[in-house]
Amino acid sequence: MGEDQTALLNSILKDINIPTARELIDLHKEFNADNYAPNRDEISKRLIAPPYRNSEENLKLKGRAGEPELRQLYINNLIKKTKFKYSVETQTGETYNHTNNNGNGRSGNIDLTIYSPESKKGDLKNLVNIEFKFCTPSAEELKRDITKLVKEKKIDGILYLSLINSNKSTIPKILEKLRKVFLPLEESKDFSKIADNKLVMIFIVVLETTYIYHNIFDFNRAKDNFDKYCEDFFVPSKFSISKIPKIKK
């Protein structure tokens, strides 16, 4: 089962994640770089990066290629390149406790859920849950997203992060935040159940540098020494790193 799950995530990486990153970069450059000719297909070109108000914090950026645009491009590629079915803002099967709900568990929403092509009413075959994040997320935001991705039983997850820019410390800091989010998961009372055959892909795209970073966290491999696995996993050298090539016409 593990090999099939890894193959599925890698096919999504190739067919959806990377093409989406390429188009998001193209959208960002179209609306923020001078004399840049967009190079997306005709469907993706119809998506516009809405203008920012002329406020001081956004003087350097003219158009937003943010989380809503990321999700739209992702769905476009899912439709164009796969047979998967999908839902948006999918209610979670589990309940979660956050600081603002008085300690009572409540359902959350998953940004996007991918189902097998054979799924139908009354017989949904959930394959992957996806959470999108734009700009550098806080530790609390990461905790909420990772909790939802991990605790939904028998469904793998993808955390898709989009950053405008980065320096040499940006990626290490994000990975360290993620390490601190993952570590307490081992103390969950139902850890053995939620982590059984669970995979979570971490995918990061940086719009200005056009680099992508990705790796798959394998809970089965992590079980024997969870602390050590987390320590070894959440470092840039363990991630596949590549520069996104330009879109070919």
Protein language model annotation of sequence segments:
Residues 164-249:
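Domain-level recognition of nuclease-like catalytic cores that cleave nucleotide substrates
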Residues 35-101, 121:
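Acidic-basic catalytic patches of nuclease active cores, encompassing PD-(D/E)XK
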